[in-house]
C-alpha cells in the first residue's frame, strides 16, 4: 500500500466499522502504518472494567520541537438508508463516500500521507489517536492519553487536530477554540389529579414551562473578542402521560447551554438553579459538562498555518470558536492546538462524503505546514 496516497489509505481506514467506542481494529491498523514509517507506537487501553477504549500514541524522533497530530477513529452509527454501504467506501463522481469521510478518517490519512512524503524531520513528530471521541467514554480517550504523556514527560509544542473545521470550502475556517457544552436535566414534582378538578392538584408542567421561559429570556452575555454569546437550547420536554384527563405528578425537561469563556460549568449551574428556585421548591436539577470553553491564543504557528492555507487554496482562513465540542478543549490545557480538517457539511449525516480533490489538497496543506513548522521553530530557538 502506498502510504503517500491519502485516498487509498482513507478507503482502508473507513472500511473498519468503528462505531464508538472503536473496537474494530482501526487503531492497530494505524499503528502498523506508522510503524512502517519508523514511528514508535504505543497502543494504550483505558477503561473502568465495563468498557475499554483503545488509543494510540506514536512518535518519530525525540525531544523538541514536537508537532503532534490528534484525531479519532470512532464514528457515529450510520443510521438511515445509505445509497452505498457506509463501511465499504466508494469513490464516485469525484466524491469519497462512507462513514468517517468528513469526521475524520480521511483527515487522519491525509496527515499520514503528508508525513510519508517528508524528506527529513528536524525534530519530533507525534500522533495522538483515540478510539472514543464521539461517545460517552471520552474520559478514557484523549484525556487519559494526555495523562499518560504527562507521566512520561511528553509535551508537544503544538497540535493540529484534524476535525472537520472547514465550512463551505476547504481551508475557509481554522478553529482555535471551542465553546463549553453543558447539559441540564430538570424534573418538577406536582400533585396528580383529574383535569376537571385542578384546585385539587398541582400541574408540574406549568412549573417546567415557567422555568424554561425564564431561562430562555435570560441574556447570558454579549460574547467576547473570540467567542459569540452563550446560548441555551431546549432539547426535551416530557411527562410520560398517555391519559387525556390526568394531571401528571411530574414533568421533566432537558436543555443545553453552549457557553464562552465568561462562564464555568459551576457558575452556570448556580445561575440555572437560582432560576428554578424562583419558581418552585419541588424540583431537582442535574448537569453534565462535556468540556469548558477553551481557546489557544493565535501564535506564530497559527499564522504559519494560515499562510500555508492561503498558498494552497487562495483562501484567507477565518479563526473561529463556534461549532460543536471536540477534544481540543482537553488538548488546549496541555498545549496550543488548532483544528484544520475537511468541510463539515456531511459529517454525521447519511451518505457522508468529501471531495477527493479536498483530501489531496488537505494532504498538501499538512505537508507544507509540517515543513514550515520546523523552520519556524528553529528560527525561534
UniProtKB/Swiss-Prot annotation:
PANTHER family noted in UniProt: ACETYLORNITHINE DEACETYLASE, N-ACETYL-L-CITRULLINE DEACETYLASE
Protein name, per record: Succinyl-diaminopimelate desuccinylase
Gene (name only): dapE
Role noted for this protein: Catalyzes the hydrolysis of N-succinyl-L,L-diaminopimelic acid (SDAP), forming succinate and LL-2,6-diaminopimelate (DAP), an intermediate involved in the bacterial biosynthesis of lysine and meso-diaminopimelic acid, an essential component of bacterial cell walls.
Family designation: Belongs to the peptidase M20A family. DapE subfamily.
EC number of the protein: 3.5.1.18
Leading EC class: hydrolase
Gene3D superfamilies: 3.30.70.360, Zn peptidases
Coiled-coil segments on the chain, per record: none
Active-site annotation: 74, 133
Catalytic activity, as annotated: N-succinyl-(2S,6S)-2,6-diaminopimelate + H2O = (2S,6S)-2,6-diaminopimelate + succinate
Family matches, as PROSITE patterns: ARGE_DAPE_CPG2_2
Entry keyword annotation includes Protein biosynthesis: no
Pathway the protein contributes to: Amino-acid biosynthesis; L-lysine biosynthesis via DAP pathway; LL-2,6-diaminopimelate from (S)-tetrahydrodipicolinate (succinylase route): step 3/3
Top-level taxon of the source organism: Bacteria
Keywords: Amino-acid biosynthesis, Cobalt, Diaminopimelate biosynthesis, Hydrolase, Lysine biosynthesis, Metal-binding, Zinc
CDD domains the UniProt entry points to: M20_DapE_proteobac
